[in-house]
């Protein structure tokens, strides 16, 4: 039926060890969910041992809550929203992908934000101690997360469960930018970068934005 004769040569390609896309997503997003609480709770004790005692400021606590909410959202989307074109990817990708999230958004972002440089005394009298300033960017972050979620729902509805159907998304922010899911993701991290004026947050924002531009 397929037109294959007895003398035909069948070539197979060994793709190596494979792992499901969903598993990779769950593992990479789990990193920050574990690392951020450890740094947030442990940083004051650790820095005090080196002679730099500090108390967590309002902006630090705000970033902690927003960061945890962001990655919890990503975990839930990985389970209930995302639909993948392929069932698996090379197993090594779990190391590569997790390095980005565990190292950059976990250790680098957490280590920089939850440090004496943003503690109560350090931000006192600065814009980062202004609650109106912080709440403005919290609102921007919230709108960005909602925009990102709506884009993910739109993409989910384009692909019936159990299929590999590809369709062109229409409506909403898809009429304004090619990949609103990436756009709003970058915007949410811009909000955190702006409210903290943190170099570590800026590094994560730039690296993530470049990567999402390549994906787009």
Regions found by a protein language model. Give the residues of each.
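Ubiquitin system architectures
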Residues: 1-48, 58
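Hydrophobic transmembrane alpha-helices
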Residues: 46, 123-150, 154-216
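Transmembrane alpha-helices of multi-pass eukaryotic membrane proteins
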Residues: 20-36, 56-70, 88-105, 128-141, ...
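A broad, low-amplitude sensor of folded, mature protein cores
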Residues: 3-10, 61, 69, 74, ...
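Membrane-embedded alpha-helices of multi-pass membrane proteins, especially ion channels
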Residues: 32-50, 67-82, 101-115, 145-153, ...
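Helix-loop boundary elements of multi-pass alpha-helical membrane proteins
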Residues: 13-24, 75-95, 157-176
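Membrane-lumen (extracellular) interface motif
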Residues: 38-61, 75-93, 109-133, 190-203
């Amino acid at each position: 039926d397929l037109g294959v004769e007895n003398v035909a040569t069948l070539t197979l390609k060994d793709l190596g060890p494979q792992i499901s896309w969903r598993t990779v997503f769950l593992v990479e997003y789990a990193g920050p969910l574990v690392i951020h609480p450890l740094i947030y709770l442990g940083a004051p004790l650790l820095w005090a041992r080196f002679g730099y005692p500090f108390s967590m400021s309002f902006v630090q606590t705000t970033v902690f809550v927003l960061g945890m909410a962001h990655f919890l959202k990503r975990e839930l989307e990985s389970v209930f929203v995302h639909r993948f074109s392929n069932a698996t990817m090379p197993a090594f990708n779990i190391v590569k992908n997790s390095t980005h999230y565990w190292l950059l958004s976990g250790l680098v972002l957490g280590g920089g934000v939850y440090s004496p440089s943003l503690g109560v005394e350090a931000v006192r009298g600065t814009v980062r101690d202004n609650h109106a300033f912080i709440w403005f960017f919290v609102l921007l972050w919230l709108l960005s997360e909602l925009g990102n979620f709506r884009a993910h729902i739109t993409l989910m509805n384009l692909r019936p469960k159990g299929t590999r159907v590809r369709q062109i998304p229409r409506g909403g922010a898809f009429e304004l930018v090619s990949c609103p899911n990436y756009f709003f993701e970058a915007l949410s991290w811009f909000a955190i970068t702006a409210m903290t004026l943190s170099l570590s947050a800026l590094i994560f924002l730039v690296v993530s934005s470049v990567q999402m531009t390549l994906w787009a």
